[in-house]
Amino acid sequence: KEDFSDADGLRAAELEGEFAELDGWEAEPEAAVLLQGLNIPEDLHHLQMKELNAGQKIKVLLAQALFGKPDVLLLDEPTNGLDIQSIAWLEEFLINFENTVIVVSHDRYFLNKVCTHMADLDFGKIQLFAGNYDFWLESSQLAQKLQSQQNAKKEDQIKELQEFIARFSANASKSKQATSRKKTLEKITLDDIKPSSRRYPFVGFKPEREIGNDLLQVDNLSVTIEGKKILDNISFTLNKDDKVAFLANDDITTTTLFKVLMGEITPDSGTVRWGVTTSQTYLPKDPSAEFDNDLTIVDWLRQYASKEEDDNTFLRSFLGRMLFSGDEVLKKVNVLSGGEKVRCMLSKNMLSKANVLVLDDPTNHLDLESITALNDGLIAFSGSILFASHDHQFIQTIANRIIMVSDNGVVDRADTTYDEFLENKDVQQRVAALYA
């Protein structure tokens, strides 16, 4: 426009004022802070979405939801697809967020750290509890226990009254007392206690043999995928009692490592040597290829059963413990949900009787009840475990060794918990140096 009139100037001033009220001048710096907090480096900030990988796209979409200080944040599984550092940053962001957050999550540590209230949805009804996840769990279980105890006392009282009435109702001297007790009996009502709709599968791994002295030796492992170095100079030795959590800044690193260990990817260089007494069973991060057929669940599992186990009664019973009951075992595996596929894979893993479990993000797609059951099963497992996870509590309660993996080597800490690993300043400096 050639001439900028006084009216144009006034309108421009109004728009600038509105822009300032919306914190427009802070928009770009705020976006940068959010992206960097979610581990999107600055050199990627001006790329188009189509140029990012799947994990980076998820982070950008999450940053988009967090942007602009909304009145209400609705977050559905926000930790899915995030690395450990991004989850820790998100926890602090939400703790300090001044407005309302409504979140669905299966990460117990995340719920404990972030939430001030829990909304319990069961039997189509919702009940609000003040407190975090652990407080809700204890409170709800205590409430049900007290209700059951009260019902038991009422049942004893009912039995006692019924016995008195039956004994003395025909006795003239006791008839008034019997009538009084009848009235008391009529007033007693038992609480209707419905069992929770939540169901816990049974997860238990029993190795067929013990591991000898040698578990796994990895020397100078390097892997390149599509021209990008994923692993470089990776070396470590695992011992028979190790339950190892493998961490990385992105999932492709740990997934690639596990695929190499299981012989699915040939490394550019380096060697992998399993101990002669070891037997491995593997749960991949994406098990979809295992279900690319039209077998029923029971026939799919039959492929992995021994001769003694190849029996419909046994297989149906086994699947029943994994929450596939009745005719559900006749469902085709190619239509299963993500959680159902993981439960099938865990069934296969259990039938293998292997003494080494290799689990790539095993809590992915599982509900809280299944995560809890798996968590307990792995704690009780007498063999060795190599696993990757983003679930803080899962790692903390299972792992006795932490290995951080990158395209620049590893940081390896034995005889440690996850919390100790995170709190050790020297270790965290070494981790930072991996990605410098």
Each model region followed by its residue ranges:
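ABC-family P-loop ATPase nucleotide-binding domain
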Residues: 193-215
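Generic structural signal for secondary-structure transition and capping sites
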Residues: 99, 163, 170, 190-193, ...
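Leucine-rich amphipathic alpha-helices with coiled-coil/heptad-repeat character
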Residues: 4, 19, 26, 154, ...
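Short amphipathic coiled-coil heptad-repeat segments
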Residues: 32-38, 163-167, 183-188
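Extended non-transmembrane interhelical loops and adjacent amphipathic helices
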Residues: 9, 83, 179-190
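ABC ATPase nucleotide-binding domains
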Residues: 147-161, 165-167, 174-183, 199, ...
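ABC ATP-binding cassette signature C-motif
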Residues: 1-149, 208-436
